[in-house]
């Protein structure tokens, strides 16, 4: 089988932005799922955003990695266009909130408690993030789209996969591990 992951790092995402998970959810489900998974044939795809500011697009078992890279370059443009069309964001908001506050068994309560403690994120900060997502302003999402575009202009791609997949991507430099 062919397996590859095609991430890029978005350096300009504001680490303190509370709505980056919402932007990631919109891009993953309304755009990448259709163009990389359904049309491109990858087994999975998405845009992941962490509280640290680390953000990447990925695909899994992707037979068209070169095309996926081209689709990733359009994430910011997609988000801008999607917001201009005034789509209802309610489903994305609910989905994002459910990911941020899942039902937890005692083991997970301890695990997340440790995670929040070591990341210095208290209940007040969590509540502020939930409220920011519930009361999101489309202009805030447009700022994230702008940050995606700015970062993509600067380049920086990391690909992990088979030699044939990587060779098809016509990269300037390939480092073998």
Predicted feature locations:
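C-terminal regions of mature proteins
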Residues: 1, 14, 93-177
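A glycine-rich, aromatic-flanked flexible loop/lid motif
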Residues: 1-7, 37-54, 61-71, 109, ...
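His/Glu-based metal-binding/catalytic segments typifying zinc-dependent metallopeptidases
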Residues: 1-38, 177
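Short beta-strand-to-loop capping motifs
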Residues: 13-15, 58-63, 161
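Short, conserved charged micro-motifs
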Residues: 17-20, 64-70, 166-169
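M16/insulysin-pitrilysin zinc metalloprotease superfamily fold
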Residues: 47-104
